[in-house]
Amino acid sequence: GVPGPNGDVGPAGPTGPAGLDGAPGAQGPDGEPGLPGLPGQSGKSGASGQPGVPGPVGAAGKPGSIRGQPGPPGPPGDLGRPGERGAKGVRGTPGAPGVDGVAGIAGAIGFPGPMGPDGAAGPSGYPGFDGVAGKPGPQGAMGPKGQAGERGPQGTPGTQGSKGVVGPKGVVGPQGDSGDTGDAGQKGARGTAGSVGAKGTVGLPGNQGPQGPAGLKGVKGEKGEVGDKGILGPDGDKGPTGMSGDAGPAGPIGDAGIQGPPGQDGPTGAQGPRGGQGPKGPAGAVGDVGDRGSTGPAGPPGPPGPTGGGIILVPVNDQNPTRSPVSGSVFYRGQAEETDVNLGSVADVIELHKKLQHLKSPTGTKDSPARSCHDLFLEDNSTSDGYYWIDPNGGCIGDAVKVFCNFTGGVQQTCISATKNAGDLKSWSGHSIWFSDMLGGFKLTYDISRSQLQFIRAASRHAVQSFTYKCRNSAAAVIFRTQDNKEIAANKVTYDGCKSRPSVPDAAFVAVETKRVEQLPIRDFASSDIAGQHQEFGFEMGPACFY
């Protein structure tokens, strides 16, 4: 038949079991930002970073309102250049007498002096104390064979020895002497001849016979062996006092003592004998132009002139009369021929005039050198310190020399410098203490001729030269070799930072001041405290100044 209508919905069935997990869905869109989280705990300190590069120098800050404490004294600065000459001040009032200065520091240890002469023999010394007994000496060598000694006395009988062992059977002794004839026996009956009997045994030895005569002297026996070393005998008696020994050799030269204070000036010596005539001096400078001389007398009449060609009438009113050298005479000048002027001669005269002016008023330039810095100052006392040209021998200016003029302190010093005047702070090696003989050393030379130097000395009464000794682990024990090949020490110490042999670089500032101007400038120097390990030195030689 036809299907009937749908029935009513039935009641819900029981819940089925859970299904299997589905596949992961696609990623959803980003959510909204969450709220800020709470602050985290502080982390551990990181490792220190590398030092950053130095930043740029900041701008100078404003002056503080509080004055800072004075800083520690800085190290000694380098020796500065002489400052410019200041204006001459007014004369001050005499000051009060100064207090006595403190004693100067002890000078550096000097070099060992020369060995002195042998001293006179001293008096004999007191007898010395008894010496202790000496140790036994070593066994001596075997002496030579001695002579045979005399026969000694007979010794005492020895004690009876123990019974000896039975000796081996002795050999048959010699036949004994015939015995005494026995008493005649009774005649026996004749027996039958018997067989030969066996040999009888040796009889017992007989008693010892009397001592025989002494035998002949035996031959000398061989030398016996060296006996054992004897025991040490008792100490001998004290011997008599020995004679004084010879003087011992001179001991080594002791270290030089510290330099003593300068002695008092000695009395003026007697006038020396008159010296021999010196060598001819150089030509003097060209003198100033002299004043015009007076008119000389009229000369003799000249020889007759050639015959003229007739009388020339000259108007009386000629406007060119010329005064004759002879007083009261007038002659008239004719028409002279034109002549060429030698312009070269005029230039020479002008040049000579300039040279004369330079000689009269030198300016210290290469074309106008002065004799010395002193002369330059006399020409213009406002001249400041600096380098100038001088020509001490006053000859051709081609050998003029450039020097430093020091006008500070009221003296006019002419100073010349060494062409190479410094050495670095380092260890110097060599077999000599003189700097010029060391590896890399050199002699101090000066760019000035001997002639010019002699004229500078001749015009000077004093000379001074400074020296800077740079040190590390070395004391400034320095001597100098002068131009006349003498050895001198510094006699002025401004500062000595080397006396304690510092392990860090330091310096000593010394100088040589002398009235023996021929000793300067210094040509070499030596240091006696450079032989140890880690010792270094350097130097700077200042200019030699004459005044």
UniProtKB/Swiss-Prot annotation:
User: Which controlled-vocabulary keywords does the entry list?
Assistant: Collagen, Extracellular matrix, Glycoprotein, Hydroxylation, Repeat, Secreted
The record's InterPro entries line, in alphabetical order, gives:
Collagen, Collagen_superfamily, Fib_collagen_C
Q: Name one Pfam family in it.
A: Collagen
Q: Which residue intervals are annotated with compositional bias (Gly residues) in the record? A: 272-281
Region Disordered, as annotated, extends over 1-99, 116-311
Q: Where is this region: Telopeptide?
A: 308-336
Q: SMART domains in the record, alphabetically?
A: COLFI
How is this protein annotated for GO cellular component? collagen trimer; extracellular matrix; extracellular space
- Domain Fibrillar collagen NC1 intervals: 343-547
Give the family per the record.
Belongs to the fibrillar collagen family.
The name of this protein is Collagen EMF1-alpha
Report the source organism: Ephydatia muelleri (Mueller's freshwater sponge)
Q: Which gene encodes it?
A: COLF1
